[in-house]
Every structure is written in structure tokens, then in C-alpha cells.
């Protein structure tokens, strides 16, 4: 499949395993250079090595997306190491936290606040690209009520709204914004 992504650069949060790593490998197979981040150094290093073995450039760092300085430093380092940024995928989620204040707080900080911070940090690079794009990895929990992980669904709904607004706000700058809910 040719997605016309050869020589483009995409950053993906939470990309050392799972859906994030699968996206990184798919983009690398299309000829994309990839920025990887996650919280585990061994997993980040293994993911970077696997992507580089596919014949493209990869840059990875240990990042806790709730740490603004770390998140912004990763974005800047990726832009420098990979020669700019054409796309950004907001993939990290705190997941199914308890329906307690701590669960709400961790989901808000990792999902919503980190996505907002990342979009603000990556926006200048995407404006400089001829194909700037942002993708948010959502969930059907943003649209349907599920028993259990209430904070998760609420934050995914907030992200769906936020990225919908960003699609309108960033369109004049030539930046596409989409949400995908696997």
C-alpha cells in the first residue's frame, strides 16, 4: 500500500508497544521517519531499533507526557533529529482508572492536558510542513457509556470535542486534524 508518506516525519506518543508501536511500524513501512516516546527506556530503545531496522530514521526518548518539559523536549529533539515534523499522533492514555478523584486526575493529565500541550508544541512544526496532520486515537467509549472506567470514557469524549475544535481552528494553517476510535 502506498500512503504517499515516504520521507515524511510522524511523532507518536505511547509508541513502544501496542497500537502505538503498530502505527510506528506501519508508518516506517511506508517510508516515514518516526518519533517514539514512552515511559520505559528498554521498550523505547527496542522500538527505535526495530524501526531503524526497517530502513528509516527513528528518534526515541523516555517521556512521561504529564511532564510538560519532558514532552516539549521530546518534540523539539525529534524535529531536530528527524528534520522537521509532518504529523503527530496523540496516542497516550491513562487507561481504565478507578472512578475516584485520582483516576479522574490521572486520565485528565495524561489524555486531555498532555494532548493540548503536545498540540501547542508541535503546531509550529506542522505549520512549516506542506502536509501537517494530527491524529487523535480515541475510543468508542467517547460515544457510548460503558460500566467501569468512567474517567476514561469522559476524557475520550473531551478529546473528541477538543480535536474536533482543533480541526476547525487549524484548517486555515493547512493542518488536518482527525480522530480515530478503534
Place the predicted regions along the sequence by residue.
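Active-site loop-to-helix junction immediately N-terminal to the catalytic Tyr of the SDR YXXXK motif
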Residues: 104, 145-153, 165
Amino acid at each position: 500500500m502506498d500512503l504517499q508518506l515516504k520521507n515524511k516525519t510522524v511523532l507518536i506518543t505511547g509508541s513502544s508497544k501496542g497500537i502505538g508501536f503498530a502505527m510506528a511500524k506501519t508508518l516506517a513501512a511506508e517510508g516515514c521517519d518516526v518519533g517514539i516516546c514512552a515511559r520505559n527506556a528498554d521498550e523505547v530503545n527496542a522500538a527505535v531499533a526495530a524501526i531503524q531496522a526497517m530502513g528509516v530514521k527513528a528518534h526515541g526518548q523516555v517521556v512521561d507526557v504529564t511532564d510538560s518539559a519532558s514532552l516539549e523536549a521530546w518534540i523539539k529533539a525529534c524535529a531536530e533529529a528527524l528534520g522537521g515534523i509532518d504529523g503527530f499522533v496523540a496516542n497516550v492514555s491513562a487507561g481504565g482508572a478507578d472512578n475516584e478523584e485520582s483516576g479522574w486526575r490521572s486520565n485528565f493529565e495524561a489524555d486531555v492536558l498532555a494532548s493540548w500541550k503536545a498540540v501547542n508544541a508541535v503546531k509550529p512544526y506542522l505549520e512549516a510542513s506542506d502536509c501537517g496532520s494530527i491524529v487523535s486515537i480515541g475510543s468508542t467509549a467517547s460515544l457510548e457509556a460503558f460500566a467501569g472506567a468512567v474517567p476514561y470514557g469522559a476524557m475520550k469524549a473531551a478529546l473528541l470535542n477538543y480535536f474536533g475544535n482543533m480541526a476547525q481552528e487549524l484548517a486555515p494553517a493547512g493542518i488536518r486534524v482527525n480522530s480515530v476510535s478503534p
